Amino acid sequence: MANRGQFGSKFGFIMAAAGSAVGLGNIWRFPYLTGENGGGAFVFIYLCCVLAIGIPLLFNEIALGRLTGKNPIGAFRDTGSNKFWIIGAILSLCVSFFVTSYYGVIAGWTIGYIYTSLMGVELSFAEFTANPSIVIPLFIGFIGLNLLIVTKDIAKGIEKASKILMPVLFVLVLVVIIRGLTLEGASAGLRYFLVPDFSKINAATFLKALSQCFFSMSIGWGIMITYGSYLSKNESIVKSALWIGVLDTTVALMGGLMIFPAVFAFGMEPNQGPTLVFQILPHIFSEMPGGNIVGAFFFLLLCIAALTSTISMIEVPGSWLIDEKKWSRKKAAWAVAIAAIVFGIPSALSKGANDTLTNMSIQFSGMTITSFMDIMDFIWGSFFIVIVSLFVCLYVGWIIGPAKIIAELSEGTPSFSTAKFAGVTAAQVWSFFIRFICPLVIIIVILNQFNVF
């Protein structure tokens, strides 16, 4: 069997797993969803989703990975899964692979914006994304950065890179936050972001917040199962998962603190959607003293956030090739990367470079989703993430039973299954959530996507 490797320390695992969770979802997606859904009201519901749904599912996936020491498909198979339940594991590999194919395109844009910010070049976002001679090389270059890390073993590659990149990411975020808070009028942005208006809360707010929770925390991707398989039995999953949740949520909140003070200081509208980062913020930076440096810092941290996420996405199908096909790590990483580039080129061409790919659309539940990239994002980055999460929930809660996972969670944290509060243990609470609360909420989300509610 090929040597899978293992994380060398608890800190390294936390940084790698938090790096996977912390990505464009926190710094790009979370702020624009907040802007579209009532500011502080959305933040409040999101935090509730993280605590009630995200953390229990994070425990679940990491423990399943460490219990078996395998990739998602191997984890299901080794715990007695039949062919039906393995569908969930296969879908998790597909999610990580196909999201990599278009996520890498967006990450490539950040590299281009680092350069234009430093040079003080005014750039039309539409013209930039429509130029294949720019976006495709940037995309390939970004995937190449991933290969430099993923081809090395776990401790020397992903763990070492994450130990460096995650602290750098936090420092860069703080630099941009401090600069934004010094702008005149920034306080209005703080109020919008942090003060909830509960009249804005409705079913749609809750559902969008829950979907963002899955996207942001790498739940339903197979990533946490894979990373859990590299975690030593001596480490506490409970403490590590709590740290991952805290770090991921902190960066999401810091993303809002970066963006909204600057948006309000320059009189911009906060509900600009996905274009907020690439169209609105460069204009704001250009108006700031020293804005080219601040802008370059901002897009550098976006690039780092994307990198710490994509290395984990490539690792998921890569670990399957290592475990099941006995490939070397280098061969598996190259195969996944090349395939991601091939499948990602249509996404790279679908923002203006090719009319067919740009204008193609699908109808789903009253929504029109336009462009190849947006269709891929909806299918793999929204819909199937939720489906995979449901599969894993039901599989652990009702097929293999929570007992094996509770035993795994109790290693390193014996109090998880022994210490009682108000007459119940944390293990009993977790078991109730994983069997009833989490599946019920996920099913409601899925049914809502089909307009049942």
Feature map (PLM): residue ranges:
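Hydrophobic transmembrane alpha-helices that form the core helical bundles
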Residues: 54-71, 85-125, 306-320, 386, ...
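Transmembrane helix-boundary motif of multi-pass solute transporters/channels
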Residues: 11-49, 228, 238-242, 246-247
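Helix-loop-helix connectors at the membrane interface of multi-pass transporters/channels
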Residues: 4, 74, 107-130, 231-234, ...
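Inter-helical loop and helix-membrane interface segments of multi-pass membrane transporters/permeases
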Residues: 4-5, 32-37, 67-91, 104-151, ...
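A generic transmembrane alpha-helix motif of multi-pass inner-membrane proteins
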Residues: 365-396, 419-453
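Hydrophobic alpha-helical segments of multi-pass membrane transport proteins
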Residues: 307-310, 333-347, 351, 365, ...
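Membrane-embedded translocation segments of transport machinery
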Residues: 2-3, 7, 11, 159, ...
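Membrane-interface "cap" regions at the ends of multi-pass membrane proteins
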Residues: 1-28, 57-62, 66-79, 83-90, ...
